[in-house]
Amino acid sequence: MSGKARASRKKPQQVKRSLKQRANKEADLPENEVGNTAKRNRSHAKHLSSKVTGQATYVHLKRVKISSSKRTTWQPLPKDTEEYLQSMMESVILGILFNIKRKEEIQCHLNQLKKRLLQQCATLKVPPRKLNYLKDVSKMLKMEKAQERANEESLASLQEEIDKIVETTESMTESIQSLKNKIQILTSEVEEEEQEVKQVFHIDSNKVLALPELSQKSLKAPILQEEILALIPNQNALLKDLDVLHDSAPVKNVSAFIEEAYKKLDS
């Protein structure tokens, strides 16, 4: 079992070494021979991979030959593309360094790679852009300007609403403070009046009025009606006449009229 395992381990290592040697040889060959050797290597790699791993799914880049006359029209890489690449690399670096604790060395290494790539991009020449996308630029610009105006209007309306809310809040705060001051003044006045009432009416701690007692003479004094009747010589005849007047129709009509008048006044 151990001999078979060693043999199975040696096979992929030998395959890797042979592929590396072939790649190094291709680097020294001209373009025509490189294309032919690349074709042979593809078929050979597929054959070896099917034998060793059983998988033959590879992604191969297609080489396109460009004449030197076409390369004369090439231009350096645009600045906006460089800026886009720089921003994209910075965001990728931040995403990589987010969950790493000791990230000083890694950050320095990634920044060096970014610097080298940007230096290569600065000297790189690319085919000129196709200007088909410029047809809709004016339309898109109008749409963006309209959206910007709408956003500015909404921001202005929101600012006005915020200013109104702030003003109402400040006025409410001032009114609340003035009401608190009035309440304090009124409570102090009520306390002073209570003290004065206690002093005037001699109210003790149990809130009982310390009024003087009534004299016995005031309790035994005659009623006012008795005093008036004592001045009249014929009291019984006067009382009978008063009863007759009270039961008469004119007096009843007058009393009914007075009651109706009071009812109307109350309503």
Curated annotation (Swiss-Prot):
Swiss-Prot/TrEMBL GO biological process terms: chromosome segregation; metaphase chromosome alignment; positive regulation of protein localization to kinetochore
Record keywords: Centromere, Chromosome, Coiled coil, Nucleus, Phosphoprotein
Coiled-coil regions listed in the entry: 100-202
Compositional bias of kind Basic residues: 1-22, 39-49
Source superkingdom: Eukaryota
A GO CC annotation given for this chain: actin cytoskeleton
Modifications after synthesis and translation: Phosphorylation at Ser-49 is essential for CENPE recruitment to kinetochores and orderly chromosome congression.
Summary of the function given for this chain in its UniProt record: Component of the CENPA-CAD (nucleosome distal) complex, a complex recruited to centromeres which is involved in assembly of kinetochore proteins, mitotic progression and chromosome segregation. May be involved in incorporation of newly synthesized CENPA into centromeres via its interaction with the CENPA-NAC complex. Plays an important role in chromosome congression and in the recruitment of CENP-O complex (which comprises CENPO, CENPP, CENPQ and CENPU), CENPE and PLK1 to the kinetochores.
Family: Belongs to the CENP-Q/OKP1 family.
Protein name: Centromere protein Q
Species whose genome carries this gene: Mus musculus
Gene that specifies this protein: Cenpq
